[in-house]
Amino acid sequence: MFRVLAIGNSFSQDATAYLAQLAAGGGVEMEAVNLYIGGCSLATHWENMQTGAAAYERERNGASEGRTVSLAQALEEGGWDAVTLQQASHDSGWPERYFPYIRLLAGEVRARVPGARVWVHQTWAYELDSDHPAFAQYGHNQSAMFQALEAAYHQAADSIGAPLIPSGAVIQRLRSLPPFDYAHGGRSLCRDGFHMDRLYGRYALAAAWYECLMGQDVRDNPYTPSPEADAGLLALIRETVHGVCAEQRA
């Protein structure tokens, strides 16, 4: 079994909602655990690591287990193959807000779970008309927010020698395609202006995580998250995910 632990917030909750099920579609048995605190930043994760606060709701394969744990407790379960780190979306475009916390957290993860590979999960830019209070930091401009977080995430990942899961780049690429071009009548990939749509948005994130973590071509994966899903849109998402991930590997 491949075990992945996401140290995150509601954005990693979106990313892991379908991940284990999609992996099963590719013949991979996976346990995807998300440590959830809403809006949690790298600075707060580091504070919680130091204090040992049992502040994280433990979610397994997209569902809450109804219990809280500390970071140390989760890491010391052992058996993790991958551990992901991410910045809170509101801080994602500001490189100085990643440090020193991402280096400190990566060091703790590697010390406590030496068999795990550390990954950085790139979050995404808000929807064009998002009313998220932090959108003002980016001039209420989705493109500006994406460009800022793209640069910041690559800098952060490089600083700790960790590969990047390019979720933000995947979402931005999809937004350039007619079915998801919200500015011109396409459907939004967000459900509330910043969290992912529960069908296609979450599916796109799971596909990106699967292709990166497992190194498998998601275009070959038959998993369908809902009978209501449009097969053509799912295929477009898989093709887009594969393209973005291939560009990153090149």
Can you say where each PLM-predicted feature lies in the sequence?
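Alpha-helical cap/lid subdomain in secreted, periplasmic
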Residues: V69-R198, E211, D220
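Charged/polar positions on well-ordered alpha helices
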Residues: G25, S159, A207-A208
